[in-house]
Amino acid sequence: AALAPLAAKELKELVLSVNIFDDIKNLCDKGNSFAKDIMESWSMGEWFTNKPTVPESIKSVVYKVSGESNTDDFSPAQHAFTRADIPLHANIMGGVLFPSGPKEIKDLEDKFKLPVTFVGDVVGTGSSRKSACNSLLWHIGEDIPFVPNKRRGGVILGQTIAPIFFNTAEDSGALPI
């Protein structure tokens, strides 16, 4: 019972979870005030509306990759067995197109003390979208409090961004433009 207020607060901040919706609804129907608060919060979309607003301007340093960077450049298929370990898998991001990318991004962060914006001509074509976003955000994103080995945020600029990669980047908490 002592954890109920903390659990309710955290559940309100999650995107509606179909895995636990029925459990929360049943508790709500039985008069549980915490479950009622969660249901109301989900119905109002507070998991989204309570997020910080996008700032008027973003100061960052640019890491530019010319040409087409596809999902295999961000998440090489031959290393698919490491995808579950995001920090490890992110180390091999860049593949043949920009093999020193992770080091160059880190060097830019260290030199300018600014977040790095990834810029490409064509970004995110291919099929390994989520692992590609995970790898890229590991290098340009920010830690998610209390969620180990996962990051969100970061700006991705592209003359063309593959539509499904664009959506996946948004869903991952990035700002694709």
Where are the language model's segments positioned?
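Fe-S-dependent hydro-lyases/dehydratases of central metabolism
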Residues: 4-5, 9-177
